[in-house]
Amino acid sequence: MYGRGSGAEHSRGSGAEHFWDPRPEASSTVSSSLRPPSGARDLLPREVQRREKLEAQLTRVFRRHGYQRIITPTLERLETLLAGGSIRAESVLQLRDGEGTMLGLRPEFTASIVRAAATRLAGGPLPLRLYYHGSVFRNSRREEGSYSSQEFFQSGVELIGAGGWLADAEILLLLADCIRSVGISSCEFSWTLLLGDVSLTESLLSAVAPTAQAAVRRAIAQLDYVYLESAPLPEAARQIGLQILGLRGQPGSVLSDLAQLPVPPERLRDLRQLCQVLEEHGVRVVLDLSLLQTLAYYTGIVFQAVASGEIIALGGRYDRLYALYSPQQVEQPGIGFTLLPDTLLRLLPPDPQTEEMGCKRLVVPLVPAGIPAALALAARWREECTAPLTRTEAVELELLDRAPEEIEAYARQCRIPEIAWVQADGSYHITHPG
């Protein structure tokens, strides 16, 4: 899923960590052939540990709501990824296989998951509740017109086979649960749900002359009041564009304004019920009819979660996408969201537990004859770990035959609290490096 762009610069709201800190000049002295390509980066152990913890927190929430994990290919047929023209071909990193078939690295998850649902999972019980974690890859257009490739990590869910405002509510309350679980709600800043409805916005735009629709829609998506006020547009198109930009604020006020406009009454009723449920569950909602996601497959509600001026999640309803992948052109409603872990980790405060990178113990054979006993001791301590294994419960073995003072310096540098010194007869004593 895309938002208005892929980052905070399109938000409606206002450094990698390392196991050891490298020297500041290191990156500038490394040959370009030894660095990852532009838009990609290495994730070093401490950052991986934070990311894994975040993923585990989200997984618990997803499963608590009845969602099961799905893993789709990183590489797909290009036609699958384009989702019937909803995704621009130039935004996909493309390659050709040995048979000449055009392939691409997925730029988002929804198309691949809906493809799997419409083929491999067709005929099964509905609704399908699926979640995912993984990387997506995009060509992003620079201001001068060239493209740069970028890799992002995403976590999210897709609910397929359930339409209506209640399914919308499930997804949005699940999103709120995810945000609470990772600790955003307990930070100094709060988060806000920006909620729009493509069907209502398109209903209003239908009165705009076809020749002006693209320009008005683009101005709305970019919040470009200046263009709408000054461009040579038909006056009716200008007024409708400005009217849509004004439909933003507290749900009660916006819903009252919408009730005076030519929009489908059943959609207005559903949106009112949805906003009421969200309010009852403590979700801060800003209703925004100018919220137009960049993907053409959205058909109903669209939304962004914003914290501290940055988009942390986005999604929407896509009721016509399933039929594109169904061999029988069967239609099934769908809705989902994706969270942006890179942004979440940047906003969340450092976790003291993940700062403690060191393993629990370092086992050192003092003499070669003590190696069998050291191996046995390390194995026994590992087997005694009853909690889910993390690095802080791990047991390392000394491999480099270093002097005791060098071993202690290593333990201090790696924050290892205990060293077990093993004798030839299997006896050992423990020290605690300062």
UniProtKB/Swiss-Prot annotation:
Start-end of Low complexity biased regions: 27-38
PROSITE patterns for this protein: AA_TRNA_LIGASE_II (PS50862)
Annotated Gene Ontology cellular component terms: cytoplasm
Record region (Disordered): 1-48
Subcellular location: Cytoplasm
Pfam families in alphabetical order: tRNA-synt_His
Record flagged with keyword Secreted: no
Assigned keywords, A-Z: Amino-acid biosynthesis, Cytoplasm, Histidine biosynthesis
Molecular function via GO: histidine-tRNA ligase activity
Pathway info: Amino-acid biosynthesis; L-histidine biosynthesis; L-histidine from 5-phospho-alpha-D-ribose 1-diphosphate: step 1/9
GO BP, one annotated term: L-histidine biosynthetic process
Keyword Cytoplasm: yes
Main location class: cytoplasm
CDD domains: HisRS-like_core
Top-level taxon: Bacteria
Quaternary structure and partners: Heteromultimer composed of HisG and HisZ subunits.
Biological role stated in the UniProt entry: Required for the first step of histidine biosynthesis. May allow the feedback regulation of ATP phosphoribosyltransferase activity by histidine.
Miscellaneous comment text of the record: This function is generally fulfilled by the C-terminal part of HisG, which is missing in some bacteria such as this one.
Family as reported in the entry's similarity comment: Belongs to the class-II aminoacyl-tRNA synthetase family. HisZ subfamily.
Protein name (Swiss-Prot/TrEMBL): ATP phosphoribosyltransferase regulatory subunit
